[in-house]
């Protein structure tokens, strides 16, 4: 069975044919490191990690290159640095914010079981590439200088008599309608309401670099040009897959396409565009004002990362996901069972019943349903399939030990209470037996009686 992926540009599933099967290339937009990543940010991390693993499974680990960037120059970073480190020069404060936040991001995504990308470029290390693309755009008549800004003109792109794509094609928008519907105040230096910034002057104390070809003031890049530059540097002018959250389709990805295609006279930037759906919490949009804004770091204090991973993958990546406590509890119970059954088993090849749904536009929901079927039929294939999806990163004993430490429950105390309960049952003191059972339940311990004795585990 061949791999088929839904392409946001063509609005259909397409058979995946790599440009070079020995060098499959994927770019995914990464974090802007100004704050801890929230659970919505975890979705593209997990989704495209599964795709990365699947591509490596199909083409070989040495033949897949995955690039996920880090945006470390941005207004949000500047604002956070000034607020959190008022006693430091702004550049030093920015360094503190980006280093601390970047370190936490890596700790969080490692805990989610995500493989590190092949390359993780930082925007500030690619200013030269950004300047070169901007110079190409100005020379080609697609960008212009105004009041020390350099701006891209979508109108100039669509007016070009060439093989360039139409601005708005990715997001299925009409440029004329965008212009007609513009309701925001347009900066006076812009020629058109849809023109966007490639380069802007920096305020005193902010990070700054010499402008492209000296055509404007010392300043810094706009957000969109950063990803065009990093993708070009590490994957070339045209590559296989570009991914991210659906919120990035417009304007970010639309503008990336415009910049890259106009700079290099290409019909396409990426052969396939993939976007994951939105996430809400307990049927409500996640927001700080509603008090349901949850960071990955906060969730990891209560749940193993693999529980968060499974909870995310139970829903198809393009569908909206409702993040609920009930679903988390169900995911935890499922993983407890998988660890008991398969963690210490030599993994076999991933089962076809799991791989085939993944080949159909990364249908993790059906793949997970197939895992349940393997549990009682082929534990070796179950173990191999779980590892393909990024699960079973530790032994069953390590999993239980970590759960115990997280619970704060003393295993010796549990064993003592179970012995007392066994003695109470032996003397038919069922009232005392029930009291101890309830005490254990309050500690988060579930017990199971059998002919061989009483066993226990942590419940969720």
Swiss-Prot record:
Keyword Nuclease annotated: no
Position of sequence motif 'HIGH' region: 31-41
Annotated Gene3D superfamilies: Cysteine-tRNA ligase, C-terminal anti-codon recognition domain (1.20.120.1910), HUPs (3.40.50.620)
Keyword annotations of the record: Aminoacyl-tRNA synthetase, ATP-binding, Cytoplasm, Ligase, Metal-binding, Nucleotide-binding, Protein biosynthesis, Zinc
Pfam families: CysS_C, tRNA-synt_1e
An annotated GO cellular component: cytosol
GO biological process, one term: cysteinyl-tRNA aminoacylation
Assembly with partners or alone: Monomer.
Native source species: Bradyrhizobium diazoefficiens (strain JCM 10833 / BCRC 13528 / IAM 13628 / NBRC 14792 / USDA 110)
Motif ('KMSKS' region): 285-289
SUPFAM superfamilies given in the database record: Anticodon-binding domain of a subclass of class I aminoacyl-tRNA synthetases, Nucleotidylyl transferase
Gene Ontology terms, MF aspect: ATP binding; cysteine-tRNA ligase activity; zinc ion binding
PANTHER family linked: CYSTEINE--TRNA LIGASE, CYTOPLASMIC, CYSTEINYL-TRNA SYNTHETASE
Gene coding for it: cysS
Cofactor binding comment, as recorded: Binds 1 zinc ion per subunit.
Annotated InterPro entries: Cys-tRNA-ligase, Cys-tRNA/MSH_ligase, CysS_C, Rossmann-like_a/b/a_fold, tRNA-synt_1_cat_dom, tRNAsynth_Ia_anticodon-bd
Domain of life: Bacteria
Cystines in this chain: none
Keyword Transferase in record: no
EC code(s) of this entry: 6.1.1.16
Enzymatic reactions: tRNA(Cys) + L-cysteine + ATP = L-cysteinyl-tRNA(Cys) + AMP + diphosphate
Binding-site list for Zn(2+): 29, 227, 252, 256
Family: Belongs to the class-I aminoacyl-tRNA synthetase family.
Cofactor(s) it depends on: Zn(2+)
UniProt feature coiled coil, ranges: none
Binding positions for ATP per the UniProt entry: 288
Entry protein name: Cysteine--tRNA ligase
